């Protein structure tokens, strides 16, 4: 039974129930901001070194710059953006045209995103009244494509269909009932599991649901292949680009709550899915860096962090290299804004002795999830949004980008390109259908051919949609490194997966090393997902820690909580009582 005084709890439950009966409930993944202690050594200090120029690093620099801090940003690549950046396919531009725009993987901006959207609105872009934010366009439809079956369109439309809590399972059944082939029992069971999560308390989500995989939570093994592949795996990939068998129910449930329930059924947020209207670096990352540099940020590209030096329990300097001899850079405060696989290498035993929470970085799991782009000679708007290939062994998701871009694609490459289909590959370990090998054992050419074939068998059921002759060029994220045998040996930019039991292992943005702060997507945040939004929120938390440490008296960087429908506040308070009493959720059919 959870450790809490029941009398204290009951009084709090009654107050919470009354307070949240009207309006939106500020519930779900609320991470308390941990304040750094004002330290006389740092009071009034204003020089910050940001190590990493991806979304987290630039977000931290942005917030600090607006508060008058001197900011130096060090980035290992020649360009900013990290995994968000566009990656030109070198040498493909001819006749004065730009190189073809590749990328790490497709990206979209769900309606519940708040932190990164707020930052985008503060980045000037031409005459846009809302800056870079105005470069987002609505993706109105998801599509689930299946082998030997009709495709399923899933419109992102706002329904406003739930008036009382008992309506929720029926509303979810109606929402998902557009999928042919699922039995009423399967639909109802899945809807009931979603309802269970939506009406659960935060404590249960943190302690119980984080110990369950989404696959286990929805009891996928009890049902047929369509339930497993479409509702369990594909819906998960579409929402969060994660594998249902590995991902924490806490994480998947929160994203489903925000997108399917709060966004679509209750219309609490903006459009469910937004995409950029041109290659990412052109309409977001480059304008962002230009704005920051123009306002005074010092930018050091092609600079690798080799080590962090400690003295007296604090950071005294950072060893970096820009292709020549190592040098030591110094600042008052340091923000580590690199992915977890790099952070845990830099933050070794001396750091962990000062802050034991950093030891758990070793338990966080990055996985191979990366992208391929096919540059086509004709427009191919497969869906006005994401396409999930339900039966693809490599767990594919794609977007036809030309329909969203306001660019003339003939100005790239050799002039023959009219569309770009960007594909994410989420499973590098399952055998393919063309060569019978997992992606990790394929050559680059085999990877291109295998992905294309898996897409073809899902799309070319009622006519030819994908044609081999339409391919002008192809691009694979260069983070995939190939060895002498021609097969992948490393992924330099894997994606963190919120696996079972990972919530408690993720550190906060503030550490016990007074002048070290963390601003990356592995940090514990309300977002609870390795995304641009999560990195931006982590950066804001790091900045607020710096403001506390240095005695800053001005405004803090805003942190959003993600509101959930107030209709469920009473049910969630009831579940909090049940949780404290050691009882399961009243809708749960799992054995404890």
List where the protein language model places each region.
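N-terminal secretory signal peptides and thylakoid transit peptides that target proteins
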Residues: 1-16
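N-terminal Rossmann-like FAD-binding beta1-loop-alpha1 element of flavoenzymes
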Residues: 46-72
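Glycine-rich FAD pyrophosphate-binding loop
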Residues: 66-87
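Dinucleotide-binding Rossmann-like beta1-alpha1 core, especially the glycine-rich loop
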Residues: 94-189
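Active-site/ligand-binding neighborhood in enzyme catalytic cores
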Residues: 189-307, 311
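C-terminal segments that line or cap access tunnels to active or ligand-binding sites in enzymes
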Residues: 265-276, 319, 332-333, 338-506, ...
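Conserved beta-strand-loop-beta-strand element in the redox core of flavoprotein oxidoreductases
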Residues: 309-328
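Active-site-proximal substrate-binding core of FAD-dependent oxidoreductases
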Residues: 547-591
């Amino acid at each position: 039974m959870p450790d809490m005084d029941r009398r204290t709890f009951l009084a709090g439950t009654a107050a919470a129930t009354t307070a949240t009966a009207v309006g939106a409930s500020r519930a779900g993944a609320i991470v308390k901001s941990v304040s750094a202690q004002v330290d006389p050594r740092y009071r009034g200090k204003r020089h910050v070194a940001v190590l990493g120029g991806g979304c987290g690093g630039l977000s931290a620099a942005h917030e600090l710059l607006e508060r008058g801090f001197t900011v130096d940003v060090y980035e290992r690549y020649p360009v900013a953006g990290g995994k968000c950046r566009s990656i030109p396919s070198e040498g493909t531009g001819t006749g004065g045209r730009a190189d073809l725009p590749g990328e790490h993987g497709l990206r979209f901006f769900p309606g519940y995103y708040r932190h990164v959207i707020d930052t985008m609105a503060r980045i000037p872009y031409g005459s846009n009244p809302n800056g870079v934010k105005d470069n987002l366009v609505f993706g109105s439809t998801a599509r689930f494509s299946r082998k030997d079956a009709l495709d399923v369109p899933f419109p992102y439309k706002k329904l406003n269909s739930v008036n009382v809590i008992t309506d929720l399972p029926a509303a979810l059944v109606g929402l998902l009932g557009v999928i042919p082939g699922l039995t009423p029992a399967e639909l109802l069971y899945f809807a009931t599991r979603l309802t269970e999560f939506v009406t659960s308390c935060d404590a249960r989500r943190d302690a119980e649901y984080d110990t369950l995989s989404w696959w286990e939570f929805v009891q996928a093994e009890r049902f047929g292949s369509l339930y497993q592949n479409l509702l369990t795996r594909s819906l998960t990939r579409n929402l969060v680009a994660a594998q249902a068998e590995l991902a924490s129910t806490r994480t998947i449930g929160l994203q489903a709550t925000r997108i399917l329930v709060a966004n679509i059924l209750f219309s609490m947020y903006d459009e469910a899915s937004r995409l950029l209207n041109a290659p990412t670096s052109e309409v977001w990352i480059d304008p962002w860096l230009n704005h920051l540099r123009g306002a005074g940020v010092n930018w050091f590209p092609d600079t690798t962090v080799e080590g962090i030096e400690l003295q007296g329990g604090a950071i005294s300097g950072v060893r970096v290299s820009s292709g020549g001899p190592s040098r030591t850079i110094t600042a008052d405060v340091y923000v580590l804004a690199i992915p977890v696989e790099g952070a845990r290498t830099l933050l070794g035993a001396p750091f962990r002795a000062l802050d034991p929470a950093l030891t758990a970085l070793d338990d966080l799991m990055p996985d191979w999830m990366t992208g391929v782009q096919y540059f086509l000679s004709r427009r191919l708007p497969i869906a006005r949004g994401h396409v999930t290939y339900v039966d693809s062994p490599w767990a594919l998701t794609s977007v036809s980008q030309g329909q969203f871009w306001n660019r003339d694609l003939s100005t790239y490459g050799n002039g023959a390109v009219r569309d770009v289909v960007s594909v994410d590959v989420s499973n590098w370990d399952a055998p393919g259908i063309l060569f019978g090998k997992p992606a990790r054992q394929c050559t680059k050419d085999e990877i291109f051919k295998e992905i294309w074939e898996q897409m073809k068998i899902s799309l070319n059921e009622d006519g030819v949609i994908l044609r081999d002759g339409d391919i002008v060029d192809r691009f694979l994220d260069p983070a995939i490194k190939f060895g002498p045998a021609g097969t992948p040996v490393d992924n330099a930019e894997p994606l963190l997966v919120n696996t079972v039991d990972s919530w408690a292992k993720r550190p906060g943005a503030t550490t016990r090393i007074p002048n070290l702060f963390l601003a990356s997507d592995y940090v514990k945040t309300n977002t609870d997902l390795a995304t641009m939004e999560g990195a931006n929120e982590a950066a804001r938390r790091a900045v607020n820690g710096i403001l506390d440490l240095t005695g800053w008296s001005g405004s803090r960087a805003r942190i959003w909580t993600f509101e959930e429908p107030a209709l469920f506040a009473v049910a969630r308070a009831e579940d909090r009582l049940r949780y404290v009493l050691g009882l399961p959720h009243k809708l749960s059919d799992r054995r404890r």
